């Protein structure tokens, strides 16, 4: 945490799909069973911050694409809301992708992509800083698209004559391919011990 920050009120902004992808690569997990509130509180406690709010953002598959996973996410988001987490969900849309193999052949495949989550997170962060809702932005993501957001947070804070810390938190383990946080933020690496200590056991898939 930066020495410039005096107040410690933090809002956690959790990019659910990005956090899951990082945990999958780092630890080999197959289910998004992270406890977002517990993880936010644990990181804040290590740094002397007080968590004012946790906001969770994710894409959810359509019923016709994956009914089982949609049911799981619907139940998961319902529990998060009951726990006081602010939830923003967007549909995952199927997109056709093409890739060229080393031997020159072209491969076509379908992927599910979320649209609008990054923009929603950025808008909510800017609004929170403009309205002085927090002194620390705790961003669970490695998405470099947020580097410009970090610069904007600094500009807003400078105009307000205060310091706002912005940190990106993400899992790092033996399988991690990208160990960088968002440029322009403080990087908080989440190890397997901390990640496992904050699991939401209610989310275990049968």
Residue ranges and their predicted role:
Residues 1-110, 169:
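Domain-level signal for Mg2+-assisted phosphodiester chemistry and nucleotide/NA-binding surfaces
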Residues 87-206:
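Nuclease catalytic cores that cleave nucleic-acid phosphodiester bonds
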């Amino acid at each position: 945490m930066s020495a410039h920050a005096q107040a410690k009120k933090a809002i956690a902004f959790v990019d659910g799909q990005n956090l899951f992808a990082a945990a999958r690569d780092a630890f080999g997990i197959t289910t998004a069973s992270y406890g977002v509130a517990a993880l936010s509180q644990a990181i804040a406690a290590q740094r002397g911050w007080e968590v004012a709010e946790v906001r969770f953002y994710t894409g959810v598959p359509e019923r016709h694409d994956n009914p089982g996973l949609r049911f799981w996410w619907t139940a998961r988001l319902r529990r998060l809301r009951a726990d006081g987490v602010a939830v923003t969900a967007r549909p995952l849309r199927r997109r056709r992708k093409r890739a060229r193999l080393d031997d020159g052949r072209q491969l076509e495949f379908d992927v599910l992509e979320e649209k609008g989550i990054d923009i929603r997170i950025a808008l909510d962060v800017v609004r929170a800083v403009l309205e002085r809702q927090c002194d620390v932005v705790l961003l669970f993501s490695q998405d470099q698209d947020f580097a410009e957001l970090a610069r904007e947070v600094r500009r807003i804070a400078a105009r307000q004559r205060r310091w706002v810390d912005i940190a990106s938190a993400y899992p790092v383990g033996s399988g991690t391919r990208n160990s960088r946080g968002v440029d322009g933020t403080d990087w908080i690496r989440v190890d397997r011990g901390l990640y496992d200590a904050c699991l939401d056991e209610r989310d275990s898939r049968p």
